[in-house]
Amino acid sequence: MKRKGVGFSLPVTVVMLVIGFIYFASVFTFIDRWFSLTSSPGIANAAAFTALALMCIYNYSIAVFRDPGRVPLNYMPDVEDPESPVHEIKRKGGDLRYCQKCSHFKPPRAHHCRVCKRCVLRMDHHCIWINNCVGHTNYKVFFVFVVYAVTACVYSLVLLVGSLTVEPQDEEEEMGSYLRTIYVISAFLLIPLSIALGVLLGWHIYLILQNKTTIEYHEGVRAMWLAEKGGQVYKHPYDIGAYENLTLILGPNILSWLCPTSRHIGSGVRFRTAFDSIPDSSETKH
């Protein structure tokens, strides 16, 4: 579902400009200088990097424009449902989770976003770089975008370094001030981006393998401390095993893990837990 009221965003504009700059620098400077765009290796690398850039832009656009997941207006928790053994409660008191700002009950894993001013299903965090929340319906495309972005940054760095190893054939091919500027700006962008996005990718791989959101991780730290204090062992209720966790987020078909598909994600108001004996049909629908 497409978001409503999406306007101009400076961070999104910056991201698109950076993607554009890195693409043109990689193809028309690094690849051309290293292989020449008229050679077979040059054409192959240009085609591969172009495909990578297109996947970055496509997944990024979906993450920006797709609604992260709205709580249904008629949502009401069924405390007597035997197939839903886990009901999240407020941190204080024993009432079911109710959003005072939205004036409705919140499903498990949903949280209110102060920026979006509404509750988001399976909210992970609000990301300024996509001007949107990362939630139930756009989490996978956000993750896939990060995968492609890390790959593109590392690929571009390899092309940058490789193109510097080429000895100029004559004085006309010596690097001028224009090329130096491109190389300096590219290195200034690619090195910190590769590190930052690599750390972000590693973090979300860890979360996916545990079937946690960023919010749930921080809540789990406190829950683990309280459990240990009471002589108990805390287990994240939605952790059903590493591979099962992967398939719940990325899909049952390994070949589609890096594609922006989302037909497998279910409604977002109920989730499989470690206490379930039979998988929820909404979560296993292909």
From Swiss-Prot:
PANTHER family (alphabetical): PALMITOYLTRANSFERASE ZDHHC16 (PTHR12246)
GO annotations of cellular component type: Golgi membrane
Bilayer topology: Multi-pass membrane protein
Gene giving rise to this polypeptide: PAT16
Lineage: Eukaryota, Viridiplantae, Streptophyta, Embryophyta, Tracheophyta
Location of the active site: 127
Catalytic activity: L-cysteinyl-[protein] + hexadecanoyl-CoA = S-hexadecanoyl-L-cysteinyl-[protein] + CoA
The protein, known as: Probable protein S-acyltransferase 16
UniProt source species: Arabidopsis thaliana (Mouse-ear cress)
Biological role: Palmitoyl acyltransferase.
